[in-house]
């Protein structure tokens, strides 16, 4: 999938920089549609944070035979990146479960200031001074997020536990992206397996502390009824999209990664407007345009800088 577009041989960036960026854009867009099967699961009895648990545990169980086969053949079992797996898994769990404790709008805004944390972590851990275009993309991206979700003039300052969990989710995702850029994992299976394993552990621990808001455990009948769909979603959605998402930061950079994943908001907003009665007006159009422009700016300007470096 990473080989779809032209090979960028003239830059110091990954030779498939544009292809990976495009693949990440598609993966983020698919996550913007995930509310559709999520609603179906809720109607089937998988409510509250139980869907989040299933999204971690079931893909892990699917990958477990592969891990055992790798070990049998002399390769690593696959749990090679505990820090990355724990950080990214914690970010996803915090994001998903923050909706149980605070307003959706507040959770989205506080989580999606992720590009700010990524830039800060790049400065601290990678010693990267942000170039001028990063400030442009940050302004465009954050303005787009605020225009779409900030109808009440909400300034992203945490005011309750759900707000803090959403904020921490964004910080964890940013930290994991930078960690991936530093470690540059070889092969996708170890990082994917680590994500579902260590992220699953975090999700279960968090569920224990949030048990009062998790809702009652689904009945056995609900689990049995939903299991074919959960397996299908894991195989066709969770595994392929996370292959792209977890493989991207080490290849295109954590900063660009954190901008492109905002495309989830664009697709989610448009799809909700088309398929439901949710509002879609000038805020959604303008904010989505800002987010798309931010992604294009980061991709184009970053590549141009790399080309100029090679021509010096």
Model-found features: residue ranges?
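Hydrophobic transmembrane alpha-helices of multi-pass small-molecule transport proteins
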Residues: 63, 133-151, 283-302
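Loop-to-transmembrane-helix transition segments
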Residues: 19-27, 71-94, 160-169, 217-240, ...
